[in-house]
Amino acid sequence: VAQLFHADAKKVAEARDQALKRWAKNPAVDHLIGRCLSRAYRFAESALHQRKALEFDAQYLPAKVQLCHDLLRLGEEEEAWKLAGAIREDDGYNIQAHNLGLLEKEMDGYVTKSFPDFILKMPKRDWPIYGERALQLLREAKALLAPKYGIDLKRPVLVEFFGEQSDFAIRTFGALGGQGMLGVCFGTVVTMNSPGSLANGRNNWESTLWHEFCHVITLSVTQNRMPRWLSEGISVYEERQRDSAWGMPMDATFREMTLNEEKLTPFSQLSGAFMKAKSQEEILFAYYESSQAVEYLLDTYGKHKFQGILRDLAAGKRVNDAITANCENVDEIEKRFSSFMTNKAKAFGAKADWNKPKPEDLNPFDESSFSEFLKKHPTSLWALQRHAEDAIKNKNWPELLQTGQKLVELVPEDFSGTSGYSLQVQALRQMKREEDEIVMLRRIAANASGAQSTFLRLIELDWPKKRWSEVLTHARRVTALNPFLLTAQKALAEAHAALNQPTESIHAWERVLVLDQSSAAQTHFRLAQLWKPTNAAKARRHLLDSLSLAPRNREGLEMLRHF
């Protein structure tokens, strides 16, 4: 096992022969080798070793189960389902095989859309809502990233969306668990939670899909031989290249962790950043730091040298050796990268005082103590945040607005829910200053991909004013979080129609028809109006459907008279 991750195939073969010396047909040897390879995402090699184990003992159950999982991760689903069925016949109590049987039945009801470049599988209800958008985004990613990283994908990429987290877990991990995971890539197979699942509205499924497809590219380039930090770092970096609001920008938490020597992982040890993480916060920081390392390498040494690192990884080199061979000594890079990270952290809110008060700075029994502290420390973020809380409690909106403005001056890069921008929005809304509120909301919307409440508020404010381009932009941002949200789909439909984009408006109304049967009469009527100039038969069909649900609709009856 120790020899597996070296490039010397001869040593690996010698170690295997030594393990088989006492028992030449011991299936456990190849099963163990394959299992370790599978953990390193080298599924094709793992499958070969599981087949060797089964040649030694055709009934060796651990090899059958592992081969089943490897086949699923290679996209060979038909063979995997058959093998899982055979395992159930041999061992009716095998939990993994039982769960795979349940998953197979569930996925039999999925819709499968096959194209030369992609195969998409998802619950039937999902395809009309976001299927075309997923395909469009995948093709955009492939057109951009494949030539950038110098690869031509020879086979279609399989992308599967799961409506239930438990189904996603069984398909992805072989067992229940993995809560919080949005998507996983195995090479040319991607599994994702549906944007209509429990995570809807909290995570940007479009950025997640872009992230996972980037893994398809980099894992293919390196033949699945790359450390997690580099793979994740490239994916997060490419998210930021696609949309500056994606890809984990610097925030107050990352700033604090970067400036903490115990939290910041040295460049040469990034391979351990994910393994040593003890909390969700530390895992997220590992993603962030990895993406910054990738950004540093690309900006400092250029695309061609970076591609050389990936080629060397595919040949079996260790990551630090590959970086040294293509760039310079890792120890030198480590020193400069540390300075790069520190300078970036210090630049975030550089004018602000990030220190919290000491116990002796405040007297909890003296109400004037806090006011005096704020006067002495006018740039203290802690004091300004508390002052904002007091203003909200007292409904002192002008004071809240002023405090928000001060926070924006101190930390203009912060667009979080507690930022100065958010405080100003709250104050302006209460003061009924809509146009000023819109200006502030748009600044947040342009920089925060997960700000669903902000996007919805902008739709609410721009729609009555018939600012259709803005309505369209914000509705698209909402559907990147939750395409099943009716408000956003109706906004898309109305905005496209107003902008003289009938085809797009028709598609949006068709999604509304799926999502909201209670207003089907009105939706069919709108579709009839949109189809009439180009397809009278479809228009008439929708009109009749509308009138069957609302026979007293005078506009509909008048329209029918003119057919």
Which sequence ranges carry the predicted segments?
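Alpha-helical protein-protein interaction scaffolds
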Residues: V1-L103, R526-Q529
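A structural motif in tetratricopeptide-repeat
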Residues: W23, D57, D91, H377, ...
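Juxtacatalytic substrate-recognition/specificity segment
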Residues: A2, E14, K21, G109-R228, ...
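Beta/coil-rich, acidic/histidine-enriched accessory regions frequently appended to metallopeptidases
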Residues: V1, E14, Q18, V29, ...
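Register position in tetratricopeptide repeats
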Residues: F5, R39, R73, E106-M107, ...
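Amphipathic alpha-helical substructures
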Residues: K10, R73, E78-W81, M226, ...
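Canonical tetratricopeptide repeat
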Residues: L32, Q66, L100, R386, ...
